[in-house]
Amino acid sequence: MKSKFRHVALIGKYQTVASGASGASSRRVLEDIAHFLGAQGCEVVFEHDTAHNMGISGYPVLDVDAIGAKCDLGLVVGGDGTMLGIGRQLAKFGVPLIGINQGRLGFITDIPLDGYASALAPMLRGEFEEDHRSLMHARVMRDGRCVYDALAMNDVVVNRAATSGMVELRVEVDGHFVANQRADGLIIATPTGSTAYSLSAGGPLLHPSIPGWVLVPIAPHTLSNRPIVLANITEIAIEIISGRDASASFDTQSLASLLRGDRIVVTRSEHNVRFLHPRGWSYFDTLRQKLHWNEGVA
């Protein structure tokens, strides 16, 4: 049966051909998937950095903006980090994404590499589940002007430096003072990011359908300082009151150095990331498998 998606972009891990057997193996995987897509009636293109770094030739190559303008589907082969990076870039175009897991956990790249064809074939015919993930838009404000801005699908994290003491942070929500917090840092996580750093810091899991964020302190000085769930229509502002060499990271993929008095202002982005999953996909199945729930239970 002809594919529902005519133009499909392949995006892979950014390994270089100099990385030896691992790079060669990854290149073969991508080429095999491209051949499979072609057999399903898809016109395959490669994302520019993927093709360049993996040494792939013989297919059209497009940058991210061109993929957003011309492609019906993005197929991401890698781990969650690969998906986070391309998801932020393609969100404004509304291109749906399917993830094939070539990484470790794979919360958002949920199709196993082994046997991908049996999962992909019905999805290409239109048999899939779709869910949308919110993005955060973060700005670093210094003396009233924006000096850095970024999108985040997982989290925005304000951290102390590795060799310095705690930071003191002033937290406001929609202009209302919440508290001054002394801690190693503070995490603002989306439902997607609630299974990442936020979870390891004691934050709750948020179902992707919940229009919320979670604010999680990292090793707070006061034990009563607990995580709090907020509506994602709020504006969260974090001001650096004291502490040396603090920084803000966005999905752990970009970083901004912070000075005393800087404010990190976080709002919801107008764009969502569209994920496609195999028919019958369940968020709870993913949690159970990835977090090893029920293991050893008869």
Curated annotation (Swiss-Prot):
GO function terms (MF aspect): ATP binding; metal ion binding; NAD binding; NAD+ kinase activity
Intracellular or extracellular location(s): Cytoplasm
Alphabetized UniProt keyword annotations: ATP-binding, Cytoplasm, Kinase, NAD, NADP, Nucleotide-binding, Transferase
Purpose of the protein: Involved in the regulation of the intracellular balance of NAD and NADP, and is a key enzyme in the biosynthesis of NADP. Catalyzes specifically the phosphorylation on 2'-hydroxyl of the adenosine moiety of NAD to yield NADP.
Domain of life from the UniProt record: Bacteria
Broad enzyme group: transferase
An individual GO BP term: NAD metabolic process
Sequence similarity: Belongs to the NAD kinase family.
The protein's name: NAD kinase
Reaction(s) catalysed (UniProt annotation): NAD(+) + ATP = ADP + NADP(+) + H(+)
Cofactor: a divalent metal cation
Record flagged with keyword NAD: yes
Entry annotation: catalytic residues: 80 (proton acceptor)
InterPro entries referenced in this protein's UniProt entry, alphabetically: ATP-NAD_kinase_N (IPR017438), ATP-NAD_kinase_PpnK-typ_C (IPR017437), NAD/diacylglycerol_kinase_sf (IPR016064), NADK (IPR002504)
Keyword Nucleotide-binding: yes
Binding-site positions, NAD(+): 80-81, 154-155, 182, 184, 195-200, 219, 253
Source species: Albidiferax ferrireducens (strain ATCC BAA-621 / DSM 15236 / T118)
PANTHER family, sorted: NAD KINASE (PTHR20275:SF0)
EC number per UniProt: 2.7.1.23
